[in-house]
Design a protein with these regions (language model features):
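Short, ordered coil/turn segments that flank beta-strands lining enzyme active or ligand-binding pockets
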Residues: 58-59, 160
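Thiol/disulfide oxidoreductase modules built on the thioredoxin-like
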Residues: 122-131, 136-188
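N-terminal targeting signals for export/organelle localization
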Residues: 1-52, 191-192
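Structural microenvironment flanking redox-active thiols in thiol-disulfide oxidoreductases
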Residues: 86-127, 138-144
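Short active-site neighborhood of thiol/selenol oxidoreductases, capturing the structured segment around
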Residues: 64-86
């Protein structure tokens, strides 16, 4: 009896195997492969308000991007386990060092690590990152509010009006001429 049950199960499972797809005829287009986010600038969200999601500020209190309205801000989503994220952190730190001082651009790098905030502080210290605050979003509320297609690293430029200008998917040298050109698209409040 046991053999019969196993044989029936085998036959049933064999009928459930994925069927191979026939090649399309020469006059038919092949199905498009699903593409994930491509590295580079994405302007498809331009003009959307910054999400209201809250995350932790460097002191451990809650904050949202509304706190930065009136000043353009570059928001970077990163994690310690993400090699491209770690690669670009020093250039974000240098950007924060040169731009946060004059109020022309805020730089907010938000860790997506699930561990406690002190581990984010220790990680940044280990990298000798001094000018980026240890913003932390262990529940990934901010990345979730930005949409299901957000990958790490992703940087979002929010204008002084609180609306998205662009997203940059992937790592970038934020001290490069390419980055300077992109960042120039954000005009501080009151500066034409």
């Amino acid at each position: 009896m046991r053999f019969i049950v196993i044989a029936i199960a085998f036959v049933a499972l064999a009928g459930c195997q994925k069927q191979t797809q026939q090649a399309p005829a020469s006059n038919q287009a092949a199905p498009a492969a699903e593409a994930g986010p491509v590295k580079g600038v994405d302007r498809s969200h331009r003009g959307q308000p910054a999400p209201a999601a809250e995350f932790n500020n460097p002191d451990g209190g809650e904050i949202s991007l509304a706190k930065f309205k009136g000043v353009p801000v570059l928001v970077n989503l990163w994690a310690s386990w993400c090699a491209p994220c770690v690669k670009e952190l020093p250039t974000l730190d240098k950007l924060a060092q040169t731009h946060d001082v004059d109020g022309a651009l805020g730089v907010v790098a938000v860790s997506q690590d699930s561990g406690p905030q002190p581990s984010v502080v220790a990680f940044l210290k280990k990298l000798n990152v001094k000018d980026l605050g240890a913003y932390h979003d262990p529940n990934m509320a901010l990345s979730g509010a930005l949409g299901p297609d957000v990958v790490l690293p992703t940087s979002i430029l929010i204008g002084a009006d609180g609306k998205e200008v662009w997203r940059y998917v992937g790592d970038l040298d934020w001290t490069s001429p390419e980055a300077a050109k992109l960042l120039a698209e954000a005009k501080p409040a009151g500066k034409g």
